[in-house]
Amino acid sequence: MITRDFLMNADCKTAFGAIEESLLWSAEQRAASLAATLACRPDEGPVWIFGYGSLMWNPALEFTESCTGTLVGWHRAFCLRLTAGRGTAHQPGRMLALKEGGRTTGVAYRLPEETLEQELTLLWKREMITGCYLPTWCQLDLDDGRTVNAIVFIMDPRHPEYESDTRAQVIAPLIAAASGPLGTNAQYLFSLEQELIKLGMQDDGLNDLLVSVKKLLAENFPDGVLRPGFA
């Protein structure tokens, strides 16, 4: 499980699994990306982060406020080939990102201004290890009626590990089989399902994928013990 201590001490070359050297971003590249993002800060208001995946149940951030909300214009998609963390180059899985169209519900976190760069540096180490996302300022509609500007990690379709085919029948076998140093790919999907249920949120785009992955696991692990890597 990713924790603050893990992120602070992690050697990005090894902590998440074997990452192809050509894909791995240096600390300097991450810092430049963060600086470029902050240079585009739309106003002097607080900085919010939008979590639509594991940031919802495990932010590992120091924040002053959180609120559920909706991002219009983007939807969840398992469109990132996963070769580290919960997958390997030999048996890749799929990781969550955002693609254009639709809407996404999630959790927004307001970061403290006095430690803003420290928190964002940790976040960039977590999310931008290979530069697979485009950190983008977007307007969020919070459930309490406010509209805020937030940093959102959107899939970069130019990234070498971007996968355009996100049909359930294509990606379910990958997710059901993949695992890595951070656990199984399937457990990530199920944690997402559980968090959405807990928050009273619905994402119909995940339904077919959840059904397919659970069916594959039931067929291959009838005793209920998840042993990854069956494919």
Curated annotation (Swiss-Prot):
EC number: 4.3.2.7
Binding site for substrate: I49, F50, G51, Y52, G53, S54
UniProt keyword terms in alphabetical order: Lyase
Domain of life: Bacteria
Recorded catalytic activity of this chain's protein: glutathione = L-cysteinylglycine + 5-oxo-L-proline
Gene3D superfamilies: Gamma-glutamyl cyclotransferase-like (3.10.490.10)
Pfam families listed in its UniProt record: ChaC (PF04752)
One GO location term (cellular component): cytoplasm
PANTHER family: CATION TRANSPORT PROTEIN CHAC-RELATED, GLUTATHIONE-SPECIFIC GAMMA-GLUTAMYLCYCLOTRANSFERASE 2
Protein task: Catalyzes the cleavage of glutathione into 5-oxo-L-proline and a Cys-Gly dipeptide. Acts specifically on glutathione, but not on other gamma-glutamyl peptides.
Protein's name in the database: Glutathione-specific gamma-glutamylcyclotransferase
Gene: chaC
